[in-house]
C-alpha cells in the first residue's frame, strides 16, 4: 500500500463515540447533582478504588495488553460481553468495567502496533510513517484516557446509588455498542492488513515471473527498433529513387528544351517534300510474289493435250532462278535491292502480252477438241447440248450411250439456273468480262471471247443494243420455253447465292454455224443472263443507298441532339468550372502551401517529393483543358461574348513572368534572391525569348479570329447599329461610324456555315496551343533550376491562383442575367453589371 493513502484508524471513531457518551453523562450528573447525597461511604470507596485503579493502570498495561491480545485473538466480543455482565451485577465495580474498556482500546492500539510491525516487515520503507503516526495516536489516546479518568473520578464522587445504577446501565449499553463497533472495525482493519501482507507475498512470489515478462518486453523493443531501422532504410531508398527519377526527368527536359520551340504549323509537310521512294520499300518478299504471279500467269492451264511453250516463257523460267540468287546475295550483304524497273523479271513481264498467249491457248484447245468432238443428233436442244459438253469426250465415244435417254434425264433434273447446281466451267470455257455498275446505272459492254472454225481468233463485243435486233424474232419455241423456265426459277433463287456467285453465260465456242437458229438462241440466253446480273447489281446498289440514307438520318438526329446540348452549354454552365477541375486546382494550392512550410524548415527531400506531386497535378490539367476550351469555342458562347464586347487581352489569367518590362524586373530580383548562376541565367533568357516569339504569334492569330467571328455574328446572326450613343463602348475591330446591314433571319448558306465552323475549330486549336505553351514553359524551368529554386519560383508565381469560387459565382450570375434576354445589347448588359456591383450583398 502507498504511503500517501494511510490505513483507516478506527480509534478516532471509537473515541468520538466515547466522548459523546461522557458528555451525556456529565449533563445527566449536573442535572442530578441537586439531589441529596446518599451512601457517602460507598461513593468514597468507589472513588478510592477508582483512584487506585487509575494509578495502577499504567503498571498493568503490559499484562493487560498481553491478556487482551490473546482474548482479542480468541473472540474478543464474547469476553467483553461476559465482563460487562459481571460488572453489571456488581455496582462496586463500575469503574473497573470502564477501565477494562479503556484497556481493551489500548490493547487494540497495541494490536495495531504489532500489526504495524508486521506491515513494516513486509513493506520496508512505506510503513515507517504509518508506525510513527500510530505511535503518536497511542500517546494521544493515553493522554485522553488519563484526562477522562480524572474527570470521571471527580464526577463520580457526586453520584448517588440510584444515579450510579442508571449511569452504569447507560455506560454498559454505550460501552457494548462502542466495543462492538471497535471490535468490528479492528477485525476489518486486521483483515485489510492480512490482505496487504498476502498481496506483498504474492508480489514477492511473482518477482521471477516479472523478470521473464521484462525480458520478453526487452526482446519486443529490440524487434521494434529493428523494424523501424528497416522502414527508415526503405524510406531512404525510396527517396533516393525519387531523386534519381527527378534528376533523369531534369536531364530529359534539358535535352528537350535545348532545341528551339516548334509550333504545330511548322510541322506541316508539303506534298512535294513528302515523296516516298517506292523502290526502297520493295523487299525480297514482294519480288518473290511478283515472280510467282508472273510464273502462274505465264504457265498455261492443264489441258487434255500439252501445248507448246512460247520462247518468252522459256527465257523467263531461265531468268527466275538467277534473280533469286541475286536477291539472296543482296540480303546477305545487306544491300538494298535494285529498282523494280531494272529487274529482268520486270522487263520480261512488261514485254509479255497476256492476250496473245490466251488467244494462242484457245486456238490450240479448239483445234484439238474439234478432232474428237461427238456428233450430236439434230433434234437435241442447244441447252441440252451444253450439258452434254460437260461429259468427258472419251466417256461419250467409248461408251455407247443412248443420247436420247441422257437428254430425258437432264430434263427431269434441275436446270443450270437452279439453286442445287452451281455454274461450272468446261475445259474449253474462255475468260469473260462481266458487266460493272456505273454511277449512272447504265449497262456496260459485255465482251465475250468467241472462237470461229478458222485458226484466227478475235474478241467480239456485244452490247445491250444488239439485243434489239430483228433477228431475235427468229428464235425457236424451245428457246422461248427455256427462257420462261429460267425466269420462274430465278424468282425462287436465294439472294445470298446471287450475291456470292454470278451466273456465267453459256459458251458459244461450239461447232455450230453462225447463221443457225440455235446459235442465235444461245446469244439470247447470254443477253438474258447479263441483264439478270445487271438487275441484281442494281438491287444491291439500291439497298446500299438505302442503308447510307438510314445512317445519315441517324447522324442527323445525333447532330440535332448535340446542337440542343450546345445551347445549354452556352448558358450559365459555360462559366462554371467542373468539380474535377476545381478539385485539381485545390490540390495544387495545397501542394504549394506544403512547399512553403518545407522552405521555412529547409527540408530538401520533402521538397523533391512535393515537386514530383506538383508535376503530376499539372499533367492532369492537360486532360481537363480541352473540355474548358470546348465551352469557349461553342458558337452560342461566342455569340453572347460578341454581345458583351469581350476581347481577349491576355494569354492566360495570372502573373506573366515571361513578357514585358515588369517581367524583366521581376526576373532580375528573383535571380538575386535564389543565387542564379550565369549558365542558368542564360538558359532562362533563351527560354523566355522562345516563349515570347511563339506567344506573340498565337496572340495575333487569336485577335484576328475573334474579330472575324464577331463580325460574322453581327452581320449574319443579329442586327445591331452602332451610333453616337455608345461610342465609348466600341467593339474592337468595328468602327463606331459603321452601320452594319440588317438582314432578314433565315438559314445560312452552306459555305457560310462551313466557314464559321472552320473558324471556331481554329479558335479551339489556338486556345489549346496557348494554354499548353504556358504549362510546358513552366515545366521546362525544372530542368534549369534546382529543386529549392524551383519551389521558390512556384510559390511566388502560383498558376493555380485563379481557383477563387466567389469570383466564378459572380461571373456566373452576370452571365445568367445576360442570357435571360437573348436580344439584349451592350447597354443593357452594362446596366446589369452596374446593378450587380452596386449591390454586392444581393449576390
From Swiss-Prot:
Keywords: DNA-binding, Nucleus, Transcription, Transcription regulation. GO terms for cellular component: nucleus. PROSITE patterns: BZIP. It comes from the Eukaryota. Residues 27-92, 298-347, 430-478 are annotated as: Disordered. Residues 298-315 have a biased composition (Polar residues). The keyword Nucleus applies. PANTHER family: CREB/ATF BZIP TRANSCRIPTION FACTOR, GLYCOSYLTRANSFERASE-RELATED. This is Probable basic-leucine zipper transcription factor S. The lineage of its organism: Eukaryota, Amoebozoa, Evosea, Eumycetozoa, Dictyostelia.
